[in-house]
Amino acid sequence: MLSPRKVKYRKKQRGRLSGEAQKGNKISFGEYGLVSLEADFITARQIEAARVAMTRRVKRGGKVWIRIFPDIPYTKKPAETRMGKGKGGVDHWNAPVKLGTVMFEISGVPRELAESAMMLASSKLPVKTTFVVRRDLR
């Protein structure tokens, strides 16, 4: 699963996602993309599940790019622990996804196959998504 090798601070405040994506909102590498229609944090496990689903669907034919990276630590205290005694340990890593972020890209496959692979991947994600073609975003 994806996680950063090294971070400046181990723990971070939660924060929230507001507004639309200013960066990462255009298709840069592939022909087809999966764009988020909502803002949310996506875990490294969800990204991996979507990647596996896509690569199995396109088989050896195409190339898949993951455009998001989980670099936000999510902390959690153990179950049945009393309050206090400091912030909990890092449980998993999240990727912040704003509205309009291109999350995955595919190239080298027909449009129908790319669309079915992206829809399969979107079923693994907690946000509503849409399939886009490179010429749609220009």
From Swiss-Prot:
Residues 1-21 are annotated as: Disordered. InterPro entries: Ribosomal_uL16, Ribosomal_uL16_bact-type, Ribosomal_uL16_CS, Ribosomal_uL16_dom, Ribosomal_uL16_sf. GO terms for biological process: translation. Residues 1-15 have a biased composition (Basic residues). GO terms for cellular component: cytosolic large ribosomal subunit. GO terms for molecular function: rRNA binding; structural constituent of ribosome; tRNA binding. The keyword Lipid metabolism does not apply. SUPFAM superfamilies: Ribosomal protein L16p/L10e (SSF54686). Keywords: Ribonucleoprotein, Ribosomal protein, RNA-binding, rRNA-binding, tRNA-binding. PANTHER family: 50S/60S RIBOSOMAL PROTEIN L16 (PTHR12220), LARGE RIBOSOMAL SUBUNIT PROTEIN UL16M (PTHR12220:SF13). Binds 23S rRNA and is also seen to make contacts with the A and possibly P site tRNAs. Part of the 50S ribosomal subunit. Belongs to the universal ribosomal protein uL16 family. This is Large ribosomal subunit protein uL16.
